[in-house]
Amino acid sequence: MSLKIVYFGTPQFAATVLADLLHHEVNVVAVVTRVDKPQKRSSQLIPSPVKTLALSKNIPLLQPEKVSDPQFVEQLRDFEADVFIVVAYGAILKQMVLDIPKYGCYNLHAGLLPAYRGAAPIQRCIMDGVVQSGNTVIRMDAGMDTGDIANVSFVPVGPDMTAGELAEALASQGGEILIKTLQQISDGTITHTPQEASKASIAPKLSKEEGFILWDHPAEKVYAQIRGVTPAPGAWTLYSYQGKPARRLVIRKASLSSSQGVYGHPGDILLSDQQELLVACAEGAICLKEIQPEGKGVMDSKSFLNGHSGHKLKLSLNLMS
């Protein structure tokens, strides 16, 4: 395949896809990624996973502050690319950029468009209890994930799958569907199908507050919320005992409780017959497997309970508790 490709991408998801394209000898003439960002609690700048991969392969790299910068746009034109491939780049491309490549710009979206347009299709579909996701390749236009569909592939969403695990499954499949698309462009067999606007939905980026667990919902809905925000922005709650101020408790791993006859008010901490830490929900309960109390490391629920022996623990139902 002789098509010249400029690849736009930033996080690990995009790096996994890029690695697959390079493995199959796709002709990537340049890579565009976001500028390095400071590490949390440090001023040290951290390169994106895509940048690290591009440098290791000696691929020309661009990191514009703004994709509308005239100098950057001219640099893109100089590559005389046939196609731009965009995978989780993290910024909206202006029409002046979309018009540069000979055959247009194609985006790999980690969701089944037109549903879940936006930044968080993976997390949102799990939180909604969807059982099937997938990748959609679209020919980009000026809208947000509104372009015509070129190809679609499907990935089942397992009942215990987290957002992180679904992202890995989608990324591992992403290279294949893009290679198929590029081959169709090269052969002149590519087709495009307009999205059905009536079936569109939005998947905006999750806030940290959306990781706060709402225990007064049924356990299945709570479990979907936990899985959807794992690993980021992360599931958390507030716990208190003996009248002390509430403290944050991060939930690293959980499951639906199989215990029968769980009784308690939403947010009550209970023990199962197997001495598991359960949290009562509006219906059913959640079993906490691995947790991280504020100011401490990750631990299993037994260690947490041992550290609070004799104390009646209570989880908050809202952020004001």
Curated annotation (Swiss-Prot):
Claim: Membrane is one of the keywords in the record: no
UniProt xrefs under Pfam families: Formyl_trans_C (PF02911), Formyl_trans_N (PF00551)
Domain of life the protein comes from: Bacteria
Catalysed reactions, semicolon-separated: L-methionyl-tRNA(fMet) + (6R)-10-formyltetrahydrofolate = N-formyl-L-methionyl-tRNA(fMet) + (6S)-5,6,7,8-tetrahydrofolate + H(+)
PROSITE patterns reported for this sequence: GART (PS00373)
Transmembrane segments: none
E.C. number: 2.1.2.9
Gene Ontology terms, MF aspect: methionyl-tRNA formyltransferase activity
Function: Attaches a formyl group to the free amino group of methionyl-tRNA(fMet). The formyl group appears to play a dual role in the initiator identity of N-formylmethionyl-tRNA by promoting its recognition by IF2 and preventing the misappropriation of this tRNA by the elongation apparatus.
Protein name, per record: Methionyl-tRNA formyltransferase
Organism: Chlamydia abortus (strain DSM 27085 / S26/3)
Primary gene name: fmt
